[in-house]
Amino acid sequence: MLPALAILAAALCFSTTGTAQALAGVDASPLAVGAARIVVGGGILGLLALAQRSPGRARSGSRASTAALIAVGALGVLAYQPLFFLGTRENGVAIGTVVALGSAPIATGIVDAVRLRRAPTPRWMLATAVALIGVVLVSGVTGGATALAPGGLLASAGAGMSYALYTVCGKALIERGWNSTRVMGAVFGIAAVASLPVLVLAGTSWLLTPNGLALALWLGVVTTAIAYLLFGWGLARLSAVTVSTLTLAEPLAATLLGLFVLREHLTLVSGIGLALIAVGLAVVSAPSRRREEVPDATARA
């Protein structure tokens, strides 16, 4: 149960992103804010990884394949932010978010099934389907027909695939004997270095204001460094597909933060959506006869 709680805690950290930006009210582009988040948070994770002892020789896989997993994972981290923001710009925040979040567990299931040559369990499929219906209802995209930009839909789906890539690559590295903190540090540390020029080009003047600096630190420390330490710890002990479904707690928590912190209003449809997400999370988190937890060396460490 603790691994599932760790992932839910990570999702809670992720969910504060929108509320933090709303409260900060800084004049910065989403690309600049996203790059600052990766630079700060990825930098912290990278330093934590460097401070650890060498993981020793991997149990399987060549150095080249390990480097490829790290590179693909870092590429997933880098691609997620611009693809997500492009999707929301083209089709609106609600639709862009629901497509990105909704496609992430589906993409993870496909990528992980190809990697393991094994289909996800029926229970995972059911729990994910229920939670995804909840995400759609919470997003408010069910009311009326809307003309959608195909490019925006592809970008949002690409964001979901980017999430799947760094999740599955991280899981593969953990299975090779890497400590989860070192995995997150390697993937996000490389992404942080690559995000520096993006941040400079996107503009840094907002970081010189008190609210801007506070926002960058919150997003970097809480929604990235702490969140992905928890995420990695849970990923070492759960399957990638289970982790991807559990992170659907993010829109649930974000909606609740909007209600209690930003004084937003909850519609009946959104309330039903929250309940469905909770049901899906409960189903995927419940103990089963065949344990989801992964008894590898890094999980016991």
What does each model-found stretch correspond to?
Residues M1-A4, V26-A35, G61-T66, G140-S162, ...:
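Juxtamembrane helix-entry segments on the extracytoplasmic side of multipass membrane proteins
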Residues A32-G43, F84-A119, W124, A159, ...:
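Specific alpha-helical transmembrane segments that line the substrate/conduction pathway
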Residues I38, G140, G212, L248-A301:
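C-terminal-most transmembrane helix of multi-pass membrane proteins
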Residues G25-A79, S103-V111, M161-C169, M184-A202, ...:
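Transmembrane alpha-helices of multi-pass small-molecule transport proteins
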